[in-house]
Amino acid sequence: MSQPATHSDAEPATRLVLEQLSCERDDRLLFSGLSFTASAGEIWQITGANGAGKTTLLRILVGLHGFYEGERQWWQPQWQQQLLYLGHEPGVREELNPLENLRYACALSQQGGDPMAALAAVGLQGFEEVPAAHLSAGQKRRIALARLWLDRKAVWVLDEPYTAIDQDGVAALDQQIQQAAEAGTLVIYTSHHQVGDGVRRLHLAHGQAEVTEGGRV
């Protein structure tokens, strides 16, 4: 398996700046006045009850939701080329097998690496050619997560990545996220599961956003 690329020390440390971000949905305020700065090598955990706006916030960050007020600024004009976004749904094509799904996703995002090794890393060795329609929800989630074992992007935005994976999968994902951050990747994810110590936490509740655990507002 090829080694994931690391990021040059010459690149700016700041990856993302949000200033006074606000969003409503169905005439209900999700969050207001959200401001924070996220930098290379940081892990940000976004928490909140169902409906608090976690997924909406991630979709704003990656450019899939345009109905908001405030400023969202990434570190470079071509930021989308250096972004890996995994949504709440696995995004797997049922008619394709895991290997075909992974190759298809990599072609769309211009992501390199060894798909066979990535599938083995997430416990899908031996299932590479089984149609996704015949796999469990957890196995489909692992197909999506396998992209985290390919050539590394500068930013990972992950919506509930721990859904439908077993204890071994959780441990492997924890390790991969921590290693990515150590190599300079900014990781932003939604989950009630905390990856480890030093994680910056953003909690959404009652239209407000609170940054804790060392997050800079």
UniProtKB/Swiss-Prot annotation:
Indicate which residues the UniProt annotation says bind ATP.
G48, A49, N50, G51, A52, G53, K54, T55
Q: Mainly resides where?
A: membrane
ABC transporter domain boundaries: 16-214
Q: What is its EC number?
A: 7.6.2.5
| Alphabetical UniProt keywords | ATP-binding, Cell inner membrane, Cell membrane, Cytochrome c-type biogenesis, Membrane, Nucleotide-binding, Translocase, Transport
NCBIfam families xref list: ccmA, PRK13538.1
Q: What is this protein identified as?
A: Cytochrome c biogenesis ATP-binding export protein CcmA
What is the scientific name of the source organism?
Alcanivorax borkumensis (strain ATCC 700651 / DSM 11573 / NCIMB 13689 / SK2)
